[in-house]
Amino acid sequence: MRPMTRKTRIQPIEHAVEDDDNGYDRPSKSQLKREMHALQELGQALVDLPKDALKRMPMPEDLADAVREARRITDHEGKRRQLQYVGRVMRSLTDDETAALRTALDAQRGVNKAATARLHWIERTREQLLASDDALTEFLRQHPDADIQEGRTLIRNARKEAQQGKPPRYFRELFQWIKAAGGASDSDDEAAGDAGDDHDDEA
């Protein structure tokens, strides 16, 4: 009796998928698109910064030039093209440079958040002082070092100029009085809507 021979099925050789020449996964198209979009947003955030804050951003000179140019352009289409260019320059940054920019922007946003909250408090307090004499009593109780006579004079004059439709001189001065009494920093805007254009650039 002839011995039975077992047929061995030859399995196909599975070739290892080569990620790339360097042995790591190449980013997918969707990942690259997300990264490009994130850099574009970062560039837009730089363009939107107040000029004093922009000076503190750790930017290479070519990026700084591109951002300043984008801030100067007022034409919608021209600005859109320049923002795209800012995004291209952003993509040339190293990871460390990008990380440094993000860190600086996050710090600036924290400062802005605190300053905005303080600004809103001053505005609310001013409205309360103009609306009720009792508000001044409460304010002075909380801020005993404030100049009482000056505060009363400013409130009286601000009410009068509002009734007469005059320019809001004392209205603005009352803002400054509240800011000084409340210990707010000098970086606060003088009044909502009364600040200068933050996007004016140096000559």
UniProtKB/Swiss-Prot annotation:
Pfam families: DarP. One of its GO terms (cellular component) is cytosol. The keyword Mitochondrion does not apply. The keyword Cytoplasm applies. It is found in: Cytoplasm. It comes from the Bacteria. Residues 186-203 have a biased composition (Acidic residues). Keywords: Cytoplasm, Ribosome biogenesis, RNA-binding, rRNA-binding. InterPro entries: DarP, DarP_sf. One of its GO terms (molecular function) is rRNA binding. Belongs to the DarP family. Member of a network of 50S ribosomal subunit biogenesis factors which assembles along the 30S-50S interface, preventing incorrect 23S rRNA structures from forming. Promotes peptidyl transferase center (PTC) maturation. This is Dual-action ribosomal maturation protein DarP. It comes from Burkholderia cenocepacia (strain ATCC BAA-245 / DSM 16553 / LMG 16656 / NCTC 13227 / J2315 / CF5610) (Burkholderia cepacia (strain J2315)).
